[in-house]
C-alpha cells in the first residue's frame, strides 16, 4: 500500500484545522504573524491513459523533456517560487518515481524544499489525493496544487500575496486562485483538451463561469452573470490554464465533504454552481510574460520541449543544469545548438537550429538535424534526416533513415532506410525496419495491444503483472508488414479517419485531432492548393507569420529612424523569431519581402523602377549585415532568391529593376553568383517565373555573371 514520510509535529490536528485554516493571514494581538512556510501538493500521476503505451514502461512524470525528467522541472519551479515542503503523491509506477527522487538533489539534506513521498495503490483521482491530504492533516495554511508534469518559470509571489489579502479582507471567502497565462487560441502551447472559456468579474478577477470548450461550437452563459455585476464581466478565451492553483486548506476539506469531486474541474464547477449556498469563491491570476504549461499529451510535449530549447522557460534552459547531474553539462551556441560532453559529429553533418545532443551521442556523416532533441548515448548513422525528432536514451538510428515529428523512447532502434512519417511513436526497445515506411500516427510497442483488455481492472496498480505480460509477448510473433523484416514490436494505432473509432483516434497520443467535418461550411468548401498545405505543415499559424512580418517591418522602421545598429536589429528580430515560433527559412522569406516592400511603404502612389531602385539600394547597403546573419548556406541563398522572385511576381511593374536589385545583393556579398545562376536555371518553375526570366536586363545580368565565373575559373 503506502509508504509515507513522517509528517512534522507542527501540523495541527483535524479539530483545529476545521476552523477554516490560517491561510487568511489572521492577526494575533497587535502584531501580524508572518506567513507560515509555503507547502505544495504535487500529484505525480495523471489518472488517465493519454501517454499509453509509453507510460506502460515509465510514469509520465519521469518522461525526459529536453533530457530532464518532467518532475524535476516541476520541483525546480516550486523551489524557486519559495515552497519549503512538497508532498509528492504517487500511484502508477510509484517505485520508479520514489527511486528517482531519492537519488536526486530534492531528497538531499541541504535541499531548500523538503520533499515527502506518499505512495498508495488506492488513488484513482485528484479527489482521492486531496481527501488523503485532509485525512492526514498535511497542510496547515495556503498551499500550491500542481501536477508533476508542469513546466513553469512563473513567480507566483504576487498571486500568493493577492490570494492571502483577499482571504484576510473577505474572511476566507476565496478558497482558490487559479494561475493562467495570456495566450492566443492558435498558439502552439494551447492544448485543445484543456481549452476553457471564462467569465470573470472585471474588477475583482473572481471567476463567475468556467467551461471547457472541447467539442463545443457554441457557448451559453447564465443571464444572471451580467445582471448581477456592477463593474462589468469579461469573457476570456485568450488564457492558457497553467494547472497551478493556490489553495486554502478548505479545498482539501471540500473534497472530503463532496465525494463526487474527482478532478479540479469538478471542484471548480461545483463551487461556482453552489457559490450562493456555500459562500466560497474562486479567483484567477493572469501572467503575460512568464511561462507555464502542462505536458498533457505529445503535442504539448513537443511544444513545451521546443520552448525549453528556444529559451522561453529561462532560467530553466539545458545548459543551466538545475538538476546538478553530471550528464547534464551542455554548451550553448548560436541558433540554439546544445552539445553535451563527448559528443561526436561526423563530416558534413549539419545542426541547423534548435538541436540538443545528449552526452556520449555519436552522429555520422552528412546528417541533417533540425528542431530535435537527442538523448544521451544515442548512435545516428550516415545520411540521416531528423526533423522535429525526439530521441531518448540509447536510441540507434541506422544509415539513410528519415524521422519527422516523431518520438523514439529508450533504446529503440531504427534500421537502414526507414522513414517515420509525422506523429509516429516507438516505445522502449522497439525495433523497426529495414526498408519500411511507417504511416503517419503509427504507434509501435513491445506490449501487445490486446494486453490492454486484461489490465482494465488494475490499470492504475503498479507493475506486478509485468512478468505475465512478458510471457504473453513471447507467445505472439511480430508482423513484418507492420515493423519490417527485422522488426520487434506491435502496431497499436495508425490514424485512419474511416474507422468507427474516430473519436478515440482524435484523442490520440498527440492530442485532439481536428475533425474536418466539424469545420464551418465556409472553411470546408474552400479549396486549398496542395502546395499551400505543404507550406503550412510544420510551420506556425499564418496569423503568426503575418504578425511577425509586421513586427519586423516596425523594427526596421524604428532602426532607420533611431539609427539602431545592425547587431541590435538582429537581436530584436531573433527575439521576435522565438516569440512567434518562426523558422530560419521563414525569417529569410519575411526579411527579404519586408525590405523589398519598404520603399513602397514610405511613398504614396506608384513607384517607377528607377525611383524604386533609388530608394531600395541604400536600404540594402545599410541592412546588408542583417541579411548576412541569416543567409549563410546555399539553401539559405535559394530561399532568399525565391522570396525575391515572389515579390517581383506580385509587383510586375517593378520587374525591370530586378537585375539592379540582384546586382546589389551580389555586390554586397549577400548572395553568391553560383546560387544566383542556380536559381535562374531552375526548371521546375511556374509560367510566370519563366516569363520573369525572359526580362532582358535580367538576362544581361546573368550573362555577365556567367562570364565573370568563367574568367574566375580561367584565372584559377
UniProtKB/Swiss-Prot annotation:
It holds the Pfam family LbH_EIF2B. Residues 18-28 have a biased composition (Gly residues). Residues 538-715 form the W2 domain. Residues 1-35, 443-481, 517-539 are annotated as: Disordered. GO terms for biological process: astrocyte development; astrocyte differentiation; cytoplasmic translational initiation; hippocampus development; myelination; oligodendrocyte development; ovarian follicle development; positive regulation of apoptotic process. One of its GO terms (molecular function) is translation initiation factor activity. This is Translation initiation factor eIF2B subunit epsilon. It comes from Rattus norvegicus (Rat).
